[in-house]
Amino acid sequence: MNEPSKGGAKTVKLAERRVFSQSFKPLYQEGMGLVEQAAEYLDGKGRAEAKKLSRLAATLYAAESMRLTTRLMQVASWLLLQRAANSGEMTRDQVASEKSKVRLDTASAHDDAAGWGELPADFLDLVTRSLRLQALVRRMDDEIYGAGAVLDMQPVARRTNPVSDQISLLNTAFARG
């Protein structure tokens, strides 16, 4: 937990203290709560709201809901691994090995993407909250496991890449069948 530095002082890693202590519970509950809220929304109100969208916005909604689900499942996996280490079910080395399978870099379309303004407010709130949670978890992961644990240090929020956005929309549109 503490690393020796020059002069004999020890560096305290706040993220490590938070993750491997009782103060991890609120973060875990927040993450799992967001997973549950997103699932309820997407299976209920979100499904009804998506039917009211234009074709373009509906395609964007479908792509973003997949990104949202992927992002939340990756964050949930990370949280579950940390909880397992915290409760003694796994060693930190086991967690470090398993967490290499977890990706904390699921981006979202840029908010000026065509159709973004039509997306339901509740859905956009879930996307924003999931991006914030992912960014927090990613920073904690980087502090605990080192900068090498995260390959792409570019902020994840909403990357502007019009070509990628259009390819994603086309893939979603033609995958409907």
Model-flagged regions — what are they?
Residues 2-177:
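Surface-exposed peri-terminal alpha-helical interaction modules
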